[in-house]
Design a protein with these regions (language model features):
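Rhodanese-like catalytic fold shared by cysteine-dependent sulfurtransferases
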Residues: 2-6, 15-28, 36-39, 48-82, ...
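Structural scaffold elements adjacent to functional motifs in cytosolic proteins
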Residues: 41-43
Length: 127
């Protein structure tokens, strides 16, 4: 009984730790998905940063968060990638969690963020 209880508590603890974590996507994989038109990208950096330059096709989450359901594809299996400023930034979780709440199942995170995208030579879109 004690072993079962310990196992149950360990499982619950592990689930709590990893809840809200999203797998990383590489620069190359995201770039390919954008070129193929097979990804929805969510930028959580804010309107000012978005206007200065964002990943092509990205949705400005801060300005359009309420309309996210209208802006994301109808197919809930579509790859959705959220990003913020760079490594160590956890703001991306707001956009990723919003997509998850809407029922999207294939959500990833560009941990390099916009700074890593620029460093890797990624194209920037400006609005």
């Amino acid at each position: 009984m004690k072993k079962i209880l310990t196992l149950l508590i360990s499982t619950l603890f592990a689930t709590a730790i990893f809840a809200g974590e999203y797998p990383d996507i590489s620069f190359k994989d995201l770039q390919s998905a954008i070129k193929a038109g097979k990804v929805a990208v969510i930028d959580v950096n804010g309107a000012k940063s978005y206007k200065k330059g964002h990943i092509p096709t990205a949705i400005d989450f801060r300005s359009n968060g309420k309309d996210l359901a209208k802006l994301l594809p109808k197919d809930k299996n579509t790859l959705v990638v959220a990003y913020c400023g760079g490594p160590g930034c956890s703001a991306y979780k707001r956009g990723a969690a919003a997509a998850e709440k809407l029922g999207y199942k294939n959500i990833k995170h560009l941990s390099a963020g916009i700074s890593g995208w620029k460093k890797a030579g990624g194209e920037l879109a400006k609005k």
